[in-house]
UniProtKB/Swiss-Prot annotation:
Keywords: Cell membrane, Disulfide bond, Glycoprotein, Glycosidase, GPI-anchor, Hydrolase, Lipoprotein, Membrane, Plant defense, Signal. It comes from the Eukaryota. Its main location: membrane. This is Glucan endo-1,3-beta-glucosidase 5. Its EC number is 3.2.1.39. GO terms for biological process: carbohydrate metabolic process; defense response. It holds the Pfam family X8. Belongs to the glycosyl hydrolase 17 family. It catalyses: Hydrolysis of (1->3)-beta-D-glucosidic linkages in (1->3)-beta-D-glucans. Residues 1-26 form the signal peptide. One of its GO terms (cellular component) is vacuole. Residues 461-484 form a propeptide.
Amino acid sequence: MLFKGVFAVFFVITLLYASLLIEVEGIGVNWGSQARHPLPPATVVRLLRENGIQKVKLFEADSAILKALSRTGIQVMVGIPNDLLAPLAGSVAAAERWVSQNVSAHVSSNGVDIRYVAVGNEPFLKAFNGTFEGITLPALQNIQSAIIKAGLATQVKVTVPLNADVYQSASNLPSDGDFRPEIRDLMLNIVKFLSDNGAPFTINIYPFISLYNDPNFPVEFAFFDGTGTPINDNGRIYDNVLDANYDTLVWSLQKNGFGNLTIIVGEVGWPTDGDKNANLMYARRYNQGFMNRQKANKGTPMRPGAMDAYLFGLIDEDAKSIQPGNFERHWGIFYIDGQPKYQLSLGSGNGLIPAKDVHYLAKKWCILAPNANLQDPQLGPSVSYACDHADCTSLGYGSSCGNLNLAQNVSYAFNSYYQVSNQLDSACKFPGLSIVSTRDPSVGSCKFKIMIKSEDASEASAMMPITRSTAVLLLLSICLYIVL
């Protein structure tokens, strides 16, 4: 009897420990690096560890980031950008060099716990018009061969992060899911290759995008509160779009003979700015709802149990392309300086812990001069130039700074350029229009940011992408103001 009692206690403790492991290891984050003033990798790694995050997904093999992850115990999925698919598809030797330099070197010498290599990133998006369809599988095969040759096949698995538009359902019921007809054969070849090599299928699912693309999309169905109108699929009840989308993939795999293939959700999250539905309230509601499911070990009707998933993203990226929308720069659960945007429990019961030892530029801002003429013909071109070289995405309709008046809009644009230019005197010399102020011009929830110091700042500011869409909107508002 004593033995049975001890065994029972041991069994319960084992179960509790196992559930703790599920909680800790069940969530990862995407660590993107498209920022003009990025936090030092060591600072970000400390941020990860203090918040109990033990898995990261990288979009490229940044050597500084990988070195910072050395011997931390953090599991890593390292990415290969789409622009490298062609050379890797065309040469086994090129694939072997890439694996040697970006995987083997870090695993053996630096003790980086690389678990996956992500070959490409959403290469079959409809917007790419088939550009990568002929080279993704060959690149995947060559990288796998290189991993085998390096003796890492048992530790490192290949995968291809795909957008959820690679499958569909004519009836919108998950059970009618299958891969898109025009890429179905290609998808089945990739799925078979993944299955043959014990590798996972990685999918990115974004309920926010469903809402962004369709103004008639039922808002409540995007969240996990159970308040959306449910879908009944032959007795399987779906009250949120994530579950329905995920199980559409499960059915697509199952009906083609791959029902047991492991699935990773490579990206899941909600942006906080740049659109009327991208705000702090919705982002917290979505991400906390998702984390509560993970903590409760809740899955979908077809795949019970917590998902293997990576939140998108860790930190805002103010240099990302905004071709998909202004929200693209605002997916982080932390601002660009590593400060939490809202209270979010990742499983420990506590909120997010901010980054430590972050250094900022001086407390000064570039604003519209009080005596500036709002009808000055140089005003429009000056604003356009500032927003072409900085981030003005918070000024759009429904965004955090969307209610500013004309003068405040101009000041925001000037200051954005001034900050990304490291507060150089020359960056606040719009003739007759701008001055430097030591008084914070922030308006309500619209914050006029002070940029962080970064050792890569000068290099980053030299590579700023053009953001004309926001500049055009500002020009239109200026023209309307002048006309009226």
